[in-house]
Amino acid sequence: VSAMHGMNTNELLDAVVEKFGPDQKDEDDIDAIRIAVVGRPNVGKSSLVNAFLGEERVIVSEVPGTTRDAIDTPFQYDGRKYILVDTAGIRKKSRISEATEKYSVIRTLKAVERADVVLIMLDAVEGVIEQDKRIAGYVHEQAKANIIVVNKWDLVQKDGQTMNKFDEDIRRELKFLAYSPLMYISALTKRRIFKVLELVDFVADQNSRRIATSELNQVINEAMMLNPLPGSKKVKILYCTQIRTAPPTFVFFANHPEQVHFTYMRYLENVLRKNFGFEGSPIRLILREKKNTDE
């Protein structure tokens, strides 16, 4: 082990953590929102975690890839309970060994899977790069509620249009996260960091929202009258229902589901968002076959 050069310190820390044994799940944790903070190395994940906790709970260094996973850490803010699922970060392969890369990626992916809400951190100075897209893409593929958190906002030269320009750039680069809210912060100065937690509460509520079947079908039927299914008049969506939350998942029953184009389903998703919100939450739409008795 070399403390100066960081040689083998990752393995040492892992050995120390293992001595603690598995963390026990407290009954109070049931009501807590589990938050995973993800992003590329040195984007400010550890600084944000420490700012939330008000202490140096996570090891921080200027050298990318030196943060090690902490045990899940519960904390409270404004009467609400949270659990931070800390991550090792997804590192560039050129900077670390292949074995350590695989190890850190697996731990990050597991953290995402265990989270209720994921904070996708970006660097305001460097902007969106390919590594950010890959991380955000995985969060989206896992259908996890998420917030895009742009850190180091204090280092950006600003004018009246700066935030609008950043919004446009991020939306262009991360088109698949059009539903995700944006928050600009400085983890170092703690500017707006607790606004992030307020947004976490909101997004978690949106992600667990359930819509009554009658209300749902009224909205969908009106949307289909305004913009009917293209193609054959024989193709019909008969009704829909919500089968789960987190993420909100809807089943649409059609007499010929194979003939319903994905662009029309995207239209229906936009209708759901316009009427019911679901901000920060992915939506899953499923088509199933049900024969029309009128046929």
Model-derived features with residue positions:
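C-terminal-of-GTPase-core extension/linker across diverse P-loop GTPases
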Residues: 1-85, 93-106, 110, 114-120, ...
